[in-house]
Curated annotation (Swiss-Prot):
Non-essential cell division protein. The SPOR domain binds septal peptidoglycans and is required to target DamX to the septal ring. This is Cell division protein DamX. The gene is damX. GO terms for biological process: cell division. It comes from Serratia marcescens.
């Protein structure tokens, strides 16, 4: 009968072993349940990702692996959807902005036409120092005749400006911007013969600028 006590001794050990085995069994069940939730979350996320471009989808699958320990089904896809939207929105915004920045600068110089000047061809008379001199070539009651005349004579650096004579509009054609009256007089010799025949006269630039303000 010496075998019986040994069986009796092993019984509790086996019972104890059963209890210890049960705990891992419960843990395994819990893990498999959690794994099921993770799988569901991953499937849900990959389902949502299928509508997105491939690049965000790869980001999301990486995120799904990170989220496996705590499967939060609702927030993970939303977090990844919003960057995809903003990333898509930004390029279109810049595409629309760039044409406007390209086309606005050329419009500015044309809109800033100087007051008082009717027509000019690169004239620096308006911005020249008051101590400089210019040549008055002609004057008339209409600006278009003076402009036509200046173009006909192929004048460079001319200005047709509006002033008043006896309270009525009067237009003057001046040309050139010279540092001294002597330089202006010498320039008369280089003018077309028809222009010289009108006997151009030297005028201080400050007088012309005063006329422009009238």
């Amino acid at each position: 009968g010496s075998g019986t006590p040994t069986e009796a001794q092993t019984q509790p050990q086996q019972g104890g072993a059963h209890e210890r085995v049960d705990l891992p069994g419960n843990m395994a069940d819990a893990l498999s349940q959690q794994q099921g939730q993770v799988d569901a979350a991953t499937q849900g996320m990959t389902g949502a990702a299928s509508t997105l471009p491939t690049a965000p989808a790869t980001v999301m699958s990486g995120a799904a692996a990170r989220e496996a320990t705590r499967p939060v089904q609702g927030t993970a896809p939303q977090q990844h959807k919003t960057p995809a939207k903003t990333a898509a929105a930004k390029p279109t915004a810049t595409q629309h902005k760039s044409p406007t920045t390209v086309y606005t600068p050329p419009a500015k110089p044309s809109s800033t036409a100087k007051a008082g000047a009717v027509a000019s061809s690169g004239s620096s008379v308006q911005s020249a120092p008051g101590s400089h001199y210019t040549l008055q070539l002609s004057s008339a009651s209409r600006s278009d005749t003076l402009n036509a005349y200046a173009k006909q004579q192929k004048l460079q650096n001319y200005l047709v400006y509006a002033t008043k004579r006896d309270g009525k509009p009067w237009y003057v054609l001046v040309s050139g911007n010279y540092a001294s009256s002597a330089e202006a007089k010498r320039a008369i010799a280089s003018l077309p013969a028809d222009v010289q025949a009108k006997k151009p006269w030297v005028r201080p630039v400050h007088q012309v600028q005063q006329d422009l303000k009238k």
